[in-house]
Amino acid sequence: MPLPPDITFDSLALIKMHSQSMKKILEITLAKFTVNLSIVTVYRYLTVRAYLKKNIELELDVLKDIYNIVPLNEEIAIKAAQIEADLMRKGMMPDIEDVLTAATAIYTKSLLITDDSKRYEPMRRFGLDTMPLDKFVKEVELMVEKELI
């Protein structure tokens, strides 16, 4: 499956992509794709980094240099409210971070890369497209392999 040019990471995917073991994959990803981050994802990532006693001002500068950080705007807020209200009517209580991340991916027309696709399953009918992080990594590795042939 050819990957689209625009992707969005959720917070768990972003944290894992910034691990030492994913350094090469991250470099390739940043070279090949426009990577969007919801401002909520940025907040969650910075929270983890602050917990680890990192300089989060510096961390934010790095994120701003390499990612397209998507601020919460009216369109995203409306889409998120529609999604959450619909899911609540169906008896679900979605996590606000997931709803805002999904709404951001829909707004940017990008593929949401996540470490837990099941969390986003009920939101797919709103136009959300997701891919598990491990599958994305394999697709990127295949893409590189094909370029080397």
UniProtKB/Swiss-Prot annotation:
Keywords: Hydrolase, Magnesium, Metal-binding, Nuclease, Toxin-antitoxin system. Mg(2+) binds at residues 10, 98. Signal peptide: none annotated. It comes from the Archaea. Residues 8-122 form the PINc domain. Transmembrane segments: none annotated. It is an enzyme of class 3 (hydrolase). InterPro entries: PIN-like_dom_sf (IPR029060), PIN_dom (IPR002716), PINc/VapC_TA_RNase (IPR051749), VapC_family (IPR022907), VapV_Thermo (IPR016647). Its EC number is 3.1.-.-. Its cofactor is Mg(2+). Pfam families: PIN. Toxic component of a type II toxin-antitoxin (TA) system. An RNase. PANTHER family: RIBONUCLEASE VAPC1, RIBONUCLEASE VAPC3. Belongs to the PINc/VapC protein family. HAMAP family: VapC_Nob1. This is VapC ribonuclease PF0355. It comes from Pyrococcus furiosus (strain ATCC 43587 / DSM 3638 / JCM 8422 / Vc1).
